[in-house]
Design a protein with these regions (language model features):
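Ferredoxin-reductase
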Residues: 37-131, 147-148
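FNR/FR-type flavoprotein reductase catalytic core
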Residues: 1-41, 108, 113-166
Length: 166
């Protein structure tokens, strides 16, 4: 791409290539907005089960409706919860750590009510459509073979749960 822009600049002069750079920038930003922010690259899932293991904590099991994401223990995904029976989702993508990865591709997310959207997720019901992006992160990817001591509290326990459950 850089060589193409350099060639266009050399052949047609600065004014034409400036428009090409502006056009390329608009297309790049537009694609990013459509693909990432609007969820075009997201995978469809559905809420299959919901648990409340503690006050203000929701654990939800998401089953894949298509090819599942390949998630390693401790990674996180961006999730957008949509409308379902008795639930009006936020519709925005928010990051959540995966606390369990099942063999069938189902994922468990542990969500603490900290803001408006996560507070609303406390009323989540099975059947709600979810779109997932990711996975992201490399939490303890290259773990040593030696013994480890893990220290965590609150919802920060989530990546450790994924490692324990795997």
């Amino acid at each position: 791409m850089g060589l193409g822009l350099g060639h266009a600049w050399f052949v047609s002069g600065f004014s034409n290539s400036l428009w090409m750079v502006v056009l390329l920038t608009i297309v790049s930003v537009g694609w990013r907005l459509l693909r990432a922010d609007r969820g075009m690259g997201a995978r469809p899932y559905e809420v299959s089960q919901v648990y409340h293991p503690a006050a203000h904590i929701t654990e939800t099991i998401l089953k894949p409706l298509a090819k599942p994401l390949l998630v390693a223990p401790g990674q996180f995904v961006s999730a957008a919860f949509f409308e379902g029976p008795y639930f009006q989702g936020c519709g925005d993508f928010h990051p959540y750590t995966v606390s369990q990865v099942a063999e069938d591709g189902s994922l468990t997310l542990s969500i603490k009510a900290l803001g408006a959207c996560t507070q609303h997720i406390q009323s989540l019901q099975p059947g709600v459509a979810v779109r997932l992006q990711g996975p992201y992160g490399t939490f303890l990817l290259n773990r040593p073979v030696a013994s480890e001591v893990w220290i965590a509290a609150g919802i920060g326990l989530t990546p450790f749960l994924a490692l324990l459950r795997s």
